[in-house]
């Protein structure tokens, strides 16, 4: 005989006499409580100052900030999804106090109320809280960068080289047409050539030619059509070329639909053909896997972002960290000089750091780095024992305006040298070498720091600091592409990502502490 099956009580329409509050449905150690507690401690007066009095009441900015930050913690980046969760999710209902702003209100708050440095100030306050809690010390920065795609389409590119080439061709064509017209006018009336407009004002020059042609009754239809084409087509095109170059500024490219995005080569290259995509170079500094600073830059290379990034750290916290750890993408003379002048210990690799440890490199006597150098008399000695005296200096200026000095050394005579084939392959009779002594001294000091006990410890931590943070953000939380346009809004968006990352880690720490206390009470 089968036993009777018993089910637990189930009645959807059974109302409680005293309904539970939403807070009772949320665990004590849930991350949403951490978000609420941290944001309640923030000074949001800068955001409140953007609201105007009178009119309809507004949703509270602290509530909207909590909803957006918690959404980014939960991998929710869309305003429409946030709106839906405010109707469906208990955590969102509790966090918002049952307020239900629509997606337009959420998006407007995110892109307009948090801009102009207001969100950066909130991020600074949270990092200061972490510092007071002992989670970060702000004495060391592990710096790294990654490229994140813009929301713009990859086929919206505008290239500086193409614009400059087409602009020069069109200017030459316009000039030829106008000169041909002016020569005809000069034959009819020599006085008109005396007041020829300058090339700087093509529009006035074209109008003047057409006016003179009407006054003198020039019947050359082909020439007139050419001048009218210059006025109607060529001049507007030159104006558009000028605007493209103004938007581009120092960059080599930009996107038509996100004017601040620059085309860069991304690591995520599905076609494996090196195709460039519009994006931003995102730089972060971490400590104990907490993001302490972030920046958005248009330069694709990391070395050009380091100095402004370190400046932003000092401006944000009023102090500078004593140690900086970074990979070889940041190791150049300008960055080393900046860190030395600001009292920063640079645990920063340079491009040949690992190659110098190889036996093949150390045994190659033809390399400048392995030649004997007499510092007092300023000469090098080649593998055949011949002196290479200094014969001059060369100067170069980087894209950022940093001036470098290189000394040139040249051998006295290399004719008949049995080692010439291995030494150099140039057709000139004597080998010359170029040495940047200042850069070499920076590299020597960097190697001493990196190979010290402290340096070995910091180097071993670097792969699990910013690189692990980027991996967590991109692959665990799916943030591989910005959803807002312009540098101004992209800074807000990545700032939200950074704050969400920090609060996730901080919430995990608090949860472990709470579990530890509960375990201690249970064992008493």
Positions of PLM-derived features:
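Short secondary-structure transition/capping motifs
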Residues: 24, 56-60, 71, 75, ...
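Short helix-loop boundary/capping segments at the starts of domains
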Residues: 37-48, 73-76, 88-95
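Anion-binding and metal-coordination hotspots
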Residues: 3, 9, 68, 75-88, ...
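Catalytic micro-motifs at enzyme active sites that drive phosphoryl/nucleotidyl and oxygen chemistry
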Residues: 54, 93-97, 126-128
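Hydrophobic alpha-helical membrane-insertion signals
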Residues: 2-33
């Amino acid at each position: 005989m089968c036993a009777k099956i018993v089910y637990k009580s189930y009645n959807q329409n059974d109302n409680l006499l005293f309904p539970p509050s939403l807070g009772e449905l949320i665990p004590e150690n849930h991350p949403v409580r951490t978000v609420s507690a941290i944001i309640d401690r923030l000074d949001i007066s800068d955001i409140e100052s953007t609201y105007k009095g009178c009119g309809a009441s507004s949703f509270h900015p602290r509530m909207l900030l909590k909803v957006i930050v918690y959404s980014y913690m939960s991998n929710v980046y869309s305003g429409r999804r946030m709106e839906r969760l405010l109707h469906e999710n208990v955590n969102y209902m509790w966090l918002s106090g049952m307020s239900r702003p629509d997606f337009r209100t959420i998006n407007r708050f995110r892109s307009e109320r948090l801009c102009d440095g207001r969100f950066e100030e909130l991020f600074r306050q949270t990092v200061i809280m972490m510092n007071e809690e002992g989670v970060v010390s702000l004495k060391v920065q592990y710096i790294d960068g990654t490229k994140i795609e813009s929301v713009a389409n990859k086929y919206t590119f505008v290239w500086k080289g193409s614009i400059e080439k087409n602009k020069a061709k069109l200017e030459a064509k316009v000039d030829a047409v106008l000169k041909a017209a002016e020569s005809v006018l000069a034959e009819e009336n020599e006085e008109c050539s005396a007041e020829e407009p300058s090339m700087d004002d093509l529009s006035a020059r074209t109008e003047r030619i057409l006016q003179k042609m009407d006054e003198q009754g020039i019947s050359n239809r082909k020439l007139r059509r050419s001048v009218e084409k210059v006025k109607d087509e060529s001049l507007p095109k030159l104006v558009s070329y000028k605007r493209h170059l103004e938007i581009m500024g120092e960059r080599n490219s930009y996107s038509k639909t996100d004017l601040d995005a620059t085309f860069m080569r991304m690591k995520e290259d599905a076609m494996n053909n090196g195709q460039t995509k519009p994006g931003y170079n995102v730089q972060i500094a971490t400590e104990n896997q907490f993001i302490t600073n972030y920046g958005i830059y248009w330069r694709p290379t990391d070395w050009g972002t380091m100095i402004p990034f370190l400046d932003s750290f000092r401006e944000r916290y009023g102090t500078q960290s004593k140690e900086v750890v970074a990979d070889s993408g940041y190791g150049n003379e300008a960055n080393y000089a900046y860190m030395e002048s600001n009292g920063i210990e640079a645990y920063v690799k340079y491009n040949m750091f690992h190659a110098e440890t190889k036996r093949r490199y150390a045994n190659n006597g033809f390399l400048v780095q392995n030649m004997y150098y007499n510092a007092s008399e300023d000469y090098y000695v080649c593998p055949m024992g011949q002196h290479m005296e200094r014969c001059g200096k060369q100067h170069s200026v980087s894209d950022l305006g940093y001036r470098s000095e290189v000394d040139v050394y040249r051998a006295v005579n290399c004719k008949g040298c049995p080692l010439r084939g291995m030494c150099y392959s140039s057709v000139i009779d004597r080998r010359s070498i170029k040495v940047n002594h200042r850069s070499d001294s920076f590299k020597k000091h960097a190697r001493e720091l990196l190979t010290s006990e402290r340096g070995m410890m910091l180097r071993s931590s670097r792969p699990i600091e910013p690189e692990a943070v980027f991996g967590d953000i991109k692959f665990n939380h799916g943030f591989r592409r910005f959803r807002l346009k312009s540098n101004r809004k992209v800074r807000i968006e990545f700032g939200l990502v950074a704050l969400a990352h920090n609060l996730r880690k901080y919430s995990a720490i608090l949860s472990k502490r709470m579990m530890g206390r509960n375990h201690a009470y249970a064992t008493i």
